[in-house]
């Protein structure tokens, strides 16, 4: 099955990336550092290799979290927190300089954008697992993934319509990641138990505030992120898309329909957890976040590809391929309600099947699209030289 049609191949040759970053932290602090840091890499180093190396830092971080806190509810050694912070900082740095390396080597391409943003989509899951071990979030780790996935999906959706990736003054890739790796370093000093305290104990400034002072610190951070980061960002995305759709006399309902695969994915997993007799997310947080994160990566990848290739036809239907496993999982969990709490198939095996399904689907998509784009543009994924005509 091919993912790119003849029209898409022609569109790839015309495509030009457009992005704007309004972050003051990036402009005055990080950009000068990144401009110098990119010179560490030799000119023969392909940008996609830098992207992949950065992504592997987060994979390593999540593995450390799993080894020392399998259910993300026990404190790992303090050096693990420091490692989480360092690996996230390196991921952010490598993710920022891959584009600079592409411009240095005159090797910018639509494949680079897809590869970069595709890794970023998966990074939401792997960093959520790493932070879950730092803050001992347990089942709340899934919600920390959700609050990173929603703005990412919203930004991708906005980019699809505006043709420009707009990062506001305070954004996730810059200030958000910086705040998280600082949190990792901070935890290496005070210990993971700090996050398990009530907010009034961990931050005495809030001790006088009724109700708020009794909330667990990690959960209070989750609520604050939703209120002050996720909701404003989503409102920003919707406003920008509405302006574009209105200027084109288009349908906002059809634009919003592109969000439903993600809503169904999120809702399906939550219903599965509700029906499951084993408290699914709390028992196997890594597997739930991994499987759902890969399904999310497929959704984002399909939307980015449709944008690059100007091929929106059938987009929503194709995106729903990542949802095909959920009806089976829900039906199996429902059998437990009808059979004295015992499902037809053990939930662990169903969850492992979910991860295998999403891994297979994503790998098929990624490898197929990389092959199709490299053939269409006459380039290599991990080499700077062009293919001979």
Curated annotation (Swiss-Prot):
Compartments (UniProt record): Membrane
Cofactor(s) required, per the database record: Mg(2+); Mn(2+)
GO terms of molecular function: diacylglycerol cholinephosphotransferase activity; ethanolaminephosphotransferase activity; metal ion binding
Enzyme class: transferase
Catalyzed chemical reaction(s): CDP-ethanolamine + a 1,2-diacyl-sn-glycerol = a 1,2-diacyl-sn-glycero-3-phosphoethanolamine + CMP + H(+); CDP-choline + a 1,2-diacyl-sn-glycerol = a 1,2-diacyl-sn-glycero-3-phosphocholine + CMP + H(+)
Keyword Cell division attached: no
Keywords per UniProt: Lipid biosynthesis, Lipid metabolism, Magnesium, Manganese, Membrane, Metal-binding, Phospholipid biosynthesis, Phospholipid metabolism, Transferase, Transmembrane, Transmembrane helix
Stretches of the chain forming a coiled coil according to its record: none
Residues that, per the record, bind CDP-choline: 48, 103
Pathway(s) annotated for this protein in UniProt: Phospholipid metabolism; phosphatidylethanolamine biosynthesis; phosphatidylethanolamine from ethanolamine: step 3/3; Phospholipid metabolism; phosphatidylcholine biosynthesis; phosphatidylcholine from phosphocholine: step 2/2
Chain ranges passing through the membrane: 40-60, 141-161, 176-196, 221-241, 252-272, 280-300, 322-344, 350-370
Residues at the active site: 117 (proton acceptor)
Protein name, UniProt field: Choline/ethanolaminephosphotransferase 1
UniProt organism field: Arabidopsis thaliana (Mouse-ear cress)
Gene (UniProt): AAPT1
